[in-house]
Amino acid sequence: MNLSDLKRNAYMLRGSDAKRGYMRWWHSFQGICPTTQETRTFFVEYSILNPALGTSQPILGQHPYYKRHGLKPSYLCIKAGVFPEPGDSGLQLQAYYPLTSLQVAQDPFYMQFEDCVYSENRISGSIDISDEVARHRSLMTDAGSFIWDLEVHKAVACHTGYIANAFFTAVHALGSFWHGEGIRTFFRGTV
């Protein structure tokens, strides 16, 4: 089970998957405020949807204009925030970017759009959502800002075995494939 396979964690949306596929890299972690010692649980998610359909603007499938014109969604998305706790509603920020801003390297895997960076050993970026933007319900975001810069050490992987190998992925044997490269991960940095 604890078998690292970085190829399964890399960008894989090619061929028909690039027109009808998505990938996401989800991170959930706790941070401790150095002054108050309060512990909070944060999350950062990088996702890509239908990259072959991308244009110079993000196409949001839930937006009425795009629905009317029959356009399929295609975008990069950063979602970040803090989970709610008793007496605190938490925060979820989502920012969408065009596929034209994506830069990807495969070996080692590295992805960047705008100032948001993802690699096997570092995640960093920022989101700043104004009240005006947050009023658009189709964007599904709160208003606020969030900045993160974290070193990532993936200690335990969850290898899903042969059913998610290159052959079964290529022939679309399953509707989706999952690989947990860092089901136990240590983070160090600032939020």
Describe the residue ranges of each PLM region.
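Targeting-peptide/extracellular-domain and disordered-appendage signature
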Residues: 1-191
